[in-house]
A protein has these predicted regions:
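Left-handed beta-helix
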Residues: 77-131, 135-145, 157-159, 163, ...
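Glycine-rich adenosine-cofactor-binding loop
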Residues: 4-23
Length: 216
């Protein structure tokens, strides 16, 4: 990314702000430029009101990429990612991978366009990560596992060996996908779930919620 004129973060919400920090960490480690601006349909006040000095350069709905722009996808929702990427790519946008300097990535990992690997994430040998997959802090993939495009892993998710995650899947924090399990496209896995059996496309699987045993 050293020859890129400007790295633009797409989205100024919670994950977009986290991504700005990840990009700064990459920059400080000598791996690429700092963010040069952001896009958000909420206008220029989205980050300014929180004290950020990163310039707002336009809305996602209207911005037309210029020569040298490279985009980093700061959106967590699988469906939101898909919609935004389709809009921007139709106008010629190119997307960067953002791989945090603390991520442990094996040499035999395949990583697609627009993937974000957050702090202390990891991959095993023969891992395949599709386009625009988001992997939040402390999440990891075992050997021979895969995740399809636009999938999102929240923090502390464990995808074990030979597990296959489809496209557009959302996995909540501290969930574990056991070895050889398949999760179908557009499924949702709740926080803390331990997935022993395959999950059909479009289904939702979740762990029992905490129960109140005693009141004061």
């Amino acid at each position: 990314m050293s020859a890129v004129e400007r790295l633009v973060v797409v989205g100024g919400g919670g994950f977009g702000r986290e991504l700005i920090g990840h990009i700064l960490d990459v920059h400080r480690a000598g791996g690429g430029p700092a963010a040069g601006g952001y896009l958000d349909d909420g206008g220029s006040d989205v980050l300014a009101r929180l004290g950020y000095d990163l310039p707002w350069i336009g809305s996602i709905a209207d911005y037309v990429p210029r020569d040298g722009d490279l985009f980093a996808l700061g959106i967590g929702s699988p469906e939101g990612k898909r919609q935004v990427v389709e809009k921007l790519q139709a106008r010629g946008a190119r997307f960067a991978q953002v791989i945090h300097p603390t991520a442990l990535v094996t040499a035999r990992t395949s990583i697609g366009e627009g993937v974000v690997l957050g702090p202390f994430t990891g991959t095993g040998t023969e891992t395949r990560i599709g386009r625009f997959v988001t992997v939040n802090s402390y999440s990891g993939f075992g050997h021979d596992s895969e995740a399809g495009e636009f999938t999102t892993l929240s923090a502390h998710v464990d995808v074990m060996g030979f597990a296959k995650i489809g496209s557009g899947v959302f996995i909540g924090s501290h969930a574990s996908i056991m070895p050889n399990v398949k999760v179908g496209d557009d499924a949702k896995i709740g926080a803390g779930a331990i997935v022993y059996r395959s999950v059909p496309a479009g289904a939702t699987a979740y762990a029992p919620p905490a129960k109140l045993l005693k009141r004061r």
